[in-house]
Amino acid sequence: MPKSLIPFLIVFVFLFFGCARNNMPSDHQMLENFNLNESEFERLRNISVKYDRFYYPPYDETDSTAYIISYKDKKELDSLIKKLDIMSIQYDGISEVYLLFHTWGISVSGGYKEYIYAPNLEDKIENYNKEVALDPTTEMYIVERITEEDLDQVSQRYSVSIELYRPIKNGWYIHLSREN
């Protein structure tokens, strides 16, 4: 094999494996996980809202989040994150709690799928719909929807950035976000 082909093959292998899509969990799998572990999800939410603008795990030992969490809560968070296979938790300081479950893509484009507790989400989507009514070109850049349909299937209808939400119950949703 000519030596000039080696760099090409190395780049090809990295691109092939780096761009391969991970197995994103289906809505059905995520709904089943939530229904089997609802009390644990609620416990994660309850711990998160105790701390202002909270995220976990902390970025490193010097991160202020590492210092504000009680030892008891930290131990419980670690246990729940492991049990539920959650990557990270974030609380916006107002009402929304985000539990990151799966990510894909590269730094300039990609997406994620998460559980979100958002009791005011319908108001947020209503405001988005008003914005679209005033300027229909908004949907050329981003689409935001609440739907009972499978989020993976709905996402295939759009080639723009999307924020899709599927209701679970009591303010909980599955959230699929994709940035193009």
Locate predicted features.
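Sec-dependent bacterial lipoprotein signal peptides
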Residues: 1-17
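Generic low-complexity segments that are intrinsically disordered, proline-rich and/or Lys/Arg-biased
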Residues: 3, 8, 26, 58-59, ...
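Hydrophobic alpha-helical segments, principally membrane-spanning helices and signal/leader peptides
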Residues: 3, 22, 154-156
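Hydrophobic transmembrane signal anchors and adjacent membrane-proximal interface regions, especially
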Residues: 3, 49, 66-69, 140-145, ...
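Residue-level signal for the start and early helices of compact helical domains
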Residues: 7-10, 25, 32, 68, ...
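N-terminal export/targeting and maturation segments
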Residues: 19-91
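Extracytoplasmic electrostatic interaction patches
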Residues: 84-180
